[in-house]
Amino acid sequence: MPSILERDQIAAVLVSASRDKTPAGLRDHAILQLLATYGLRSGEIRNMRIEDIDWRTETIRVRHSKTQAYTLLPLTEPVGEAILVYLRSGRPATDARELFVRTRAPYRKLDKLYSMVRRRLRDAGVKPRGKRGPHIFRHARATELLRAAVPQKIIGELLGHRSIASTAPYLKLATEDLRAIALDLPGTEVSA
């Protein structure tokens, strides 16, 4: 079963990462903001380009790595601020158009995010069950949206899914979570 991060755990990871003012720390904080806010896939972040951020309209264009379709999302203030700080103070001077690059030469796009996410979870003292890679932020975002009664179709669109069936595995955990809460209510009985 995939891990689910709760809102307070996500906040702890973001606060912990924001304290690291090194170039890698500024980059990681911006990436974690994207993961936490939008539930993006690792590949969507790694392939994000500088021109995908439109500061004038305050939007971010996301190319979904599985479907190659684009989604235009509102650029939230925390995400925009983290990206801006990274661009001004953390990103090395390079001709690479990818937004997030390695902090050491050769400056090219990141290969993977898994080890960075694992390290940042550990640094924040967050110990989720099961896997600890970037995808747990995606599951957390989908679960949070379902708990907020956002329709499954909208959740799927935000996650870049072409079909509602693709969204179902993300929502199964939230449904089980809600069922567990219902079973704990006084006066409810479970029949075997």
Swiss-Prot record:
Keyword Secreted in annotation: no
Catalytic site: R41, K66, H135, R138, H161, Y170 (o-(3'-phospho-dna)-tyrosine intermediate)
InterPro entries to which the protein is assigned, alphabetical: DNA_brk_join_enz, Integrase-like_cat_sf, Integrase_catalytic, Tyrosine_recombinase_XerCD
Single GO term (MF): DNA binding
Alphabetical keyword list: DNA integration, DNA recombination, Plasmid, Transposable element, Viral genome integration, Virus entry into host cell
Domain of life: Bacteria
Gene Ontology terms describing biological process: DNA integration; DNA recombination; establishment of integrated proviral latency; symbiont entry into host cell; viral genome integration into host DNA
Keyword Lipid biosynthesis: no
Pfam families tied to this protein: Phage_integrase
Stretches assigned to the Tyr recombinase domain: 1-183
PANTHER family, per database record: PHAGE INTEGRASE-RELATED, TYROSINE RECOMBINASE XERD
Family designation: Belongs to the 'phage' integrase family.
Protein name: Putative integrase/recombinase y4gC
